[in-house]
Amino acid sequence: MELSDANLQTLTEYLKKTLDPDPAIRRPAEKFLESVEGNQNYPLLLLTLLEKSQDNVIKVCASVTFKNYIKRNWRIVEDEPNKICEADRVAIKANIVHLMLSSPEQIQKQLSDAISIIGREDFPQKWPDLLTEMVNRFQSGDFHVINGVLRTAHSLFKRYRHEFKSNELWTEIKLVLDAFALPLTNLFKATIELCSTHANDASALRILFSSLILISKLFYSLNFQDLPEFFEDNMETWMNNFHTLLTLDNKLLQTDDEEEAGLLELLKSQICDNAALYAQKYDEEFQRYLPRFVTAIWNLLVTTGQEVKYDLLVSNAIQFLASVCERPHYKNLFEDQNTLTSICEKVIVPNMEFRAADEEAFEDNSEEYIRRDLEGSDIDTRRRAACDLVRGLCKFFEGPVTGIFSGYVNSMLQEYAKNPSVNWKHKDAAIYLVTSLASKAQTQKHGITQANELVNLTEFFVNHILPDLKSANVNEFPVLKADGIKYIMIFRNQVPKEHLLVSIPLLINHLQAESIVVHTYAAHALERLFTMRGPNNATLFTAAEIAPFVEILLTNLFKALTLPGSSENEYIMKAIMRSFSLLQEAIIPYIPTLITQLTQKLLAVSKNPSKPHFNHYMFEAICLSIRITCKANPAAVVNFEEALFLVFTEILQNDVQEFIPYVFQVMSLLLETHKNDIPSSYMALFPHLLQPVLWERTGNIPALVRLLQAFLERGSNTIASAAADKIPGLLGVFQKLIASKANDHQGFYLLNSIIEHMPPESVDQYRKQIFILLFQRLQNSKTTKFIKSFLVFINLYCIKYGALALQEIFDGIQPKMFGMVLEKIIIPEIQKVSGNVEKKICAVGITKLLTECPPMMDTEYTKLWTPLLQSLIGLFELPEDDTIPDEEHFIDIEDTPGYQTAFSQLAFAGKKEHDPVGQMVNNPKIHLAQSLHKLSTACPGRVPSMVSTSLNAEALQYLQGYLQAASVTLL
């Protein structure tokens, strides 16, 4: 694409069309842009439009399109073509900073994001002058430009907050500090002075405070990994100014908005974060500044209102106190009883109150409420911060704090008892306070793992939680119901089993509550209880204990999916899945109804899949239905096929990308349930599974391979006789997979199934070509993962076709190649093979090479016989060699999978690990001893002589042990 006016005009027209609400106009325009984005100059045309277009809407559209283009294409992925040519990359980096800084703020943000995406890949090595260009702009004095630089620097450097320590990271941070720390400090001082100069100019202050917020965020990022020498030397400058800003109050910066935090609140919030970082990580250096910050932040807390706009500030201020109070250095600041009482009364209790805004979220924005309350995304809420402060104080002052709070809890419960319908919020705060007080350590998976022994959790449960849940009206006091259910979830490991068992029917009733939060919590609590483990690692609750409630449990769970707002509620679907898993055959009588409901739900959500977790659990539930029913009655598989195939066909025909991998996995499960040959309905699908377009989506690959393996296991004879013309297509899939470092193991899974199951004559003509492809890949790109898979394959081939066939195919490709493979690959690398089945395949294969391959005994290969035996004994006895060459540490590959598909999206569609050797060999060591005995019978004297002269002493000792265990000797 040339950088011409005509192309700019065309691009403008198509960008305009992408904004059209009519899909008939919008979609073709989007498709056109996708089709041309691979052309040279395409990104430069977008940047030129940004600069030259007079239409602001087109400029914004071009900036968003450019950012998304960079996001999709900038990263260079191994095994894939470079999507942006080098000339375009150079031109983009040369122009983008200047363009970003000279653009209006709306466009500046998009380009700033694009720079940070490029920077993540290219900075510093491939973009060394980026920092210099940015720092030079500080001199401009134009705060529009300066804020653009700061925003970009923030998006570039914020990853330092969560990167793992490494030499590479230190080197980069040092480079950034050398170039950036001094100019940033000077800018900080200059901006503070300008704030004084312009103290009465509201518009100037807004720009300057935006800068101070970004500068404070950069301070946090640059100080996160370690305390840089520069910032230690300049701590006085930073901390004095932070303290001044923390105590500053300028009426011009106050806002009327009760919801949205203003610039002053955002700046103070960030300063609280910065102070907490120093108090936690650099307490020695920060010690002399700390008392001033504690006082300032305390004053801030007792003077700040309850409005939502102050939430972030208050929660960060409380988090600062929480991080300080649990450090031994600062214990003395809190140990006075009056101080503790004051903190409880003035900070903790007021910030645990259930406010009108919380009530509004509970009723009208339940999804967000649940996300915050249940999933721990409440990191910035007042309640969460107050809870953390309680935990922090309990670290050193558990007794006094528990005593103070017990008084508050009792008085709150008394207030509630006086008039429950008016004072229910008092009980809500009491429950929250007890939860905060009792929880010392908590995980998502297990609830509370460590509790405050001074709080009687069971007594509180019986007296104050159970009565609310036993109330006949499930819709009364919904917040308290949700609190009670959450209490069960959190303290499920502390409350005795008999009380939990009493709760189960109550939770089942609450699945019918109108409140989305209440019925969601009820489903989640049931799901968590059903996963609890007893002393012997079996589930704590047995199917027999839940049996009395089976019908009402299943009915209420499926009814809950029909309640307003919960048609795709992931917690309910997860509870359905977990109930199936726990109850097993107890659900069989209900399956016909349940599978109909699941199928209808699947059809409905396939029109517009928008809830990935819900969809996942739905497919898991379908798999469980199939597994449980067909285990009891394999013939029932036909009923499932009748119920599901119509929907599956629609999903495949409409190319519902999110569901296709799931459909293939369920079909694999169904096909594997057939014990004999493949039904014709599956065979009709077989040719379609080989279409290249399906294999282009990496998400499909594991599921497709699994399905093809099922075809090969169940119907290899049918394929060989009725679909022999499809074998080249099958091998074409193998060839594509083997060429990719990310998917080569999937190629081996497919190849192993072909070798194991297909009639030998149907693949004879392709065998040599298969080996040539594997050797080409070995030559071009040898990785540890590939070698492990290759070793399993050649040994499986040896078991299937015989040792001599393996030697002949190697030497048929190139003379003496068999010896090279033994010497360069099998002997040195066999130790790397992992997994019991994989090791067994290799052991049996190598045993065959040692004892059933005549050239190993009487040609130039004989010298490799003992080293091969030694390597096999090493495979049995030495620890696995899990070293990876240095150059492979940074290859982005999955953990090395085993012989069967390690990746299985659906846990309940997973298949048992398949052992192709099976009962043929139970104990590979005994098998080796027996095979050596047989060989020594055929050529007396030779085997003992080779073993005694060349095998090292330790290996010889192990071998004698195998011979003894097998009750055989070498002749």
Curated annotation (Swiss-Prot):
Residues 29-102 form the Importin N-terminal domain. Detected in brain, placenta, ovary, testis and trachea (at protein level). Widely expressed. Highly expressed in testis and in proliferating cells. It holds the Pfam family IBN_N. The modification Phosphoserine is found at residues 112, 931. The modification N6-acetyllysine is found at residues 574, 824. The keyword Signal does not apply. Changing residue 842 to F: In a colorectal cancer sample; somatic mutation. One of its GO terms (molecular function) is small GTPase binding. Keywords: Acetylation, Cytoplasm, Nucleus, Phosphoprotein, Protein transport, Transport. One of its GO terms (biological process) is protein import into nucleus. GO terms for cellular component: cytoplasm; cytosol; extracellular exosome; membrane; nuclear envelope; nucleoplasm; nucleus. It is found in: Cytoplasm; Nucleus. Gene3D superfamilies: Leucine-rich Repeat Variant. The modification N-acetylmethionine is found at residue 1. Coiled coil: none annotated. Belongs to the XPO2/CSE1 family. Found in a complex with CSE1L/XPO2, Ran and KPNA2. Binds with high affinity to importin-alpha only in the presence of RanGTP. The complex is dissociated by the combined action of RanBP1 and RanGAP1. Interacts with CFTR. Export receptor for importin-alpha. Mediates importin-alpha re-export from the nucleus to the cytoplasm after import substrates (cargos) have been released into the nucleoplasm. In the nucleus binds cooperatively to importin-alpha and to the GTPase Ran in its active GTP-bound form. Docking of this trimeric complex to the nuclear pore complex (NPC) is mediated through binding to nucleoporins. This is Exportin-2. It comes from Homo sapiens.
